[in-house]
UniProtKB/Swiss-Prot annotation:
InterPro entries: Ig-like_dom (IPR007110), Ig-like_dom_sf (IPR036179), Ig-like_fold (IPR013783), Ig/MHC_CS (IPR003006), Ig_C1-set (IPR003597), Immune_Resp_Modulators (IPR050380). The keyword Hydrolase does not apply. The keyword Repeat applies. Pfam families: C1-set. Residues 5-101, 108-202, 213-305, 315-415 form the Ig-like domain. This is Ig heavy chain C region. Keywords: Glycoprotein, Immunoglobulin domain, Repeat. Transmembrane segments: none annotated. Glycans are attached at residues 166, 200, 245, 275, 374, 411, 415, 425. It comes from Heterodontus francisci.
Length: 438
């Protein structure tokens, strides 16, 4: 057989650092034949000999091999140096620089809103809501100032929530009416990735219009599209006035929808959802969210539809077994599911053990990343399992859903005696099983 060169991928942990302050790097060598001689690491030009794990080779279905290595190193040891992975076979040498992958930084949009003067008078307190929208990464710090001085009470900041890969949060300040109408200036400060944004509001100001409502439409999840007969579209209307009406249409045909969240004393947002058939969504039909109110000259409309996919590529799925030395020496083991070569980027990964769903808290999926050709994507999932469960012969399956897969779902199953993973197309009966485990 003709020798095949190794294709190298650089990987890094989902979090910027582990709990002990260390960083985890991964080197994945794929599609090579015959076997490689070694995988080594270097910091600049100096060899690294500690903190390494070398995993066994896996023979792929097409006769080539996959092998990986993991490096654990502290942030101070890395410093400003470059980390390289080197793969050698005879006189052939392949080198990959492992780049930092903290992800794109998306600064938040910060919006400050207040309760009406009528509400303040009747309730005897004012509510100010600081909305922090669409930021990445997750870590933020929210603080409040009163006439430029830090406040240590009177406000509550909600936990962040994730929507489509970015994060949002709110912080609510409650002020007695007497203080609010005393010409005091309140400031919401949001610190994110070394940048601080400030928004001010003055208590004596008479509330007035703060602009038209803003509409944001959210598509259904890929898991819902692949596994369910109906899917849910979501319309988020921020800056919504009291008494706003939100409705849905398909072209000009009205649809039955539900209001999930109404505007109240601590929010100016309305969330409306509508359930449609999966077939209608896949057809590319246009769906409209319509916002109307007596203060709007004409209703506001926003539309959403499934984008046409011109480059459909089926994913290649492989599972990397734990190293033999870990099986006998560690209390917990890791299984890695690599999914690559797919397009479009929408995909989901789950794990099952003995055909039962694994708690999502036991595994982590990376962000979807572009491959070298920028036309296909890859993602990997790391499952943590107890060594005694692995030793008992339990079967673990990486379940992958993508629209390019003929039956929409495939899995790869391994156990301690399987030697090498088996590739399985899930039957329609198993689809029902997976769906029932949502």
């Amino acid at each position: 057989a003709t020798p095949s060169p190794a294709i190298l991928y650089g990987l890094c942990s989902c979090e910027q650092t582990n709990t002990d302050g260390s960083l985890a790097y991964g080197c994945l060598a794929m599609d090579y034949s015959p076997e490689i001689t070694s995988i080594t690491w270097k910091k600049d030009k100096e060899p690294i000999t500690t903190g390494l794990k070398i995993y066994p080779s896996v023979l792929n279905k097409k006769g080539t091999y996959t092998r990986s290595s993991q490096l654990t190193i502290t942030e101070s040891e890395v410093g400003s140096s470059k980390i390289y992975c080197e793969v050698r076979r005879g006189e052939s040498l392949w080198i990959k620089e492992i780049l930092d992958c903290k992800g794109d930084i998306v600064p938040p949009t910060v919006i400050l809103t207040q309760s009406s003067s009528e509400e303040i008078t009747s309730r005897r307190f004012a509510t100010v809501l600081c909305s922090i929208i669409d930021f990445h990464p997750e870590s933020i710090t929210v603080s409040w100032l009163k006439d430029g001085q830090p406040m240590d009470s009177g406000f509550v900041t909600s936990p962040t929530c994730e929507v489509n890969g970015n994060f949002s949060a709110t912080s609510r300040l409650t002020v007695p009416a007497g203080e609010w109408f005393s010409n005091t200036v309140y400031t919401c400060q949001v610190a994110h990735q070394e940048v601080t944004q400030s928004r001010n509001i003055t208590g004596s100001q008479v509330p007035c219009s703060i602009g038209d409502p803003v509409i944001k439409l959210l598509p259904p999840s890929i898991e819902q599209v692949l596994l369910e007969a109906t899917v849910t579209l979501t319309c988020v209307v921020s800056n919504a006035p009291y008494g706003v009406n939100v409705s849905w249409t398909q072209e000009k045909k009205p649809l039955k929808s539900e209001i999930a969240v109404q505007p109240g004393e601590d929010s100016d947002s309305v969330i409306s959802t509508v359930n449609i058939s999966t077939q209608a969504w896949l057809s590319g039909a246009e769906f409209y969210c319509v916002v109307s109110h007596q203060d709007l000259p004409t209703p506001l409309r926003a539309s959403i539809h499934k984008e046409e996919v011109k480059d459909l590529r089926e994913p290649f799925v492989s599972v990397l077994l734990p190293p033999a030395e870990d099986v006998s020496a560690q209390r917990f083991l890791s299984l890695t599911c690599l999914v690559r070569g797919f397009s479009p980027r929408e995909i989901f990964i789950k794990w099952t053990v003995n055909d039962k769903s694994v708690n999502p808290g036991n595994y982590k999926n990376t962000e979807v990343m572009a491959e070298n050709d920028n036309r296909s994507f890859f993602i990997y999932s790391l499952l943590s399992i107890a060594a005694e469960e692995w030793a008992s012969g339990a079967s673990y399956s990486c379940v992958v859903g993508h629209e390019a897969i003929p039956l929409k779902i495939i899995n790869r199953t391994v156990n301690k005696s399987s030697g090498k993973p088996s590739f399985v197309n899930i039957s329609l009966a198993l689809l029902d099983t997976v769906n029932s485990c949502q």
